[in-house]
Amino acid sequence: MPFLLNNFKFSRFRSFATKLEKTKGFFNYQPLTKFKQKYSLDVAYVYIISSYNNTLISLTDFLGNVLKNESCGSCNYKGRFKRKFIASKQAAENIVSFCKFQRIKRLVIILHGYGKGSEMVIRTIREKELKILDIKIKDKKPYNGCRQKKKRRI
């Protein structure tokens, strides 16, 4: 994958750090276990949770770290206005502007819920010229459902 760190550089740094550890150098005799890896954000995940009354959008990197959260309530829509299309469009535009600021060009969309705001969010992302790689729908669908009531006989 293009967004992962080059393994060769990391292994060289790891060997350098272990040499310092063996010689009891600058690191106060503690083993070096955690190293921050740099990666470029080329692909990000957009989680859309749409209920009947609100739409929540969160942007994460490929490791699952949340970069930005938006909802219709955070865009100053309160009460019954949160379920409108305009509110979910405004939240999506805020996410898209953050993506352009961070130079994120490709998105993977993951949908949760049956609300109508998710359709508007996807439409807004397409309008703003970000490339959508995949759309995954993760709903809990009942395949047979609960047992129905006994039929009434007259």
Swiss-Prot record:
Pfam families: Ribosomal_S11. One of its GO terms (biological process) is translation. GO terms for molecular function: rRNA binding; structural constituent of ribosome. The keyword Ribonucleoprotein applies. Signal peptide: none annotated. InterPro entries: Ribosomal_uS11, Ribosomal_uS11_sf. Its main location: plastid. Keywords: Plastid, Ribonucleoprotein, Ribosomal protein, RNA-binding, rRNA-binding. It is found in: Plastid. One of its GO terms (cellular component) is ribosome. Part of the 30S ribosomal subunit. Belongs to the universal ribosomal protein uS11 family. HAMAP family: Ribosomal_uS11. This is Small ribosomal subunit protein uS11c. It comes from Helicosporidium sp. subsp. Simulium jonesii. The lineage of its organism: Eukaryota, Viridiplantae, Chlorophyta, core chlorophytes, Trebouxiophyceae.
